[in-house]
Amino acid sequence: MYTIVETETFKKQADKFWTTEERLECFTQIASDPFIGDVILKSGGFRKVRWSRAGMGKRGGVHLIYFNVLEDGLIVMSYFYAKNEQENILASELQKLKG
């Protein structure tokens, strides 16, 4: 099992949409299968996973951007956005995450 940490940006975004229970359910799934998300091309290893929200329909889901640091079992939850607000992470946002 991996350890999950959230960036401040991720926390602020996720708090707008998720309950504590939804957050824990998602994190448990990602920690048990850190390869669940698709690798984002030219991102240096960031992954994107789509997560549905109960009762919200297809457009009510969210996208999570995370980085899996395999050497030490750490997963960094980096970015969060609602599918109905944004389809993909912008290149400028991804560049900020990469540092």
Report each predicted region and the residues it spans.
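Residues that recognize and position ribonucleotide moieties
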Residues: 3, 47, 87
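Short strand-loop junctions, especially beta-strand C-caps/beta-turns
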Residues: 9, 52, 80-83
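Short, charge- and proline-biased low-complexity linear segments
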Residues: 19-37, 91, 96-97
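Short, surface-exposed coil-to-beta transition loops
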Residues: 60-64
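Enriched for short, Lys/Arg-rich terminal
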Residues: 68-99
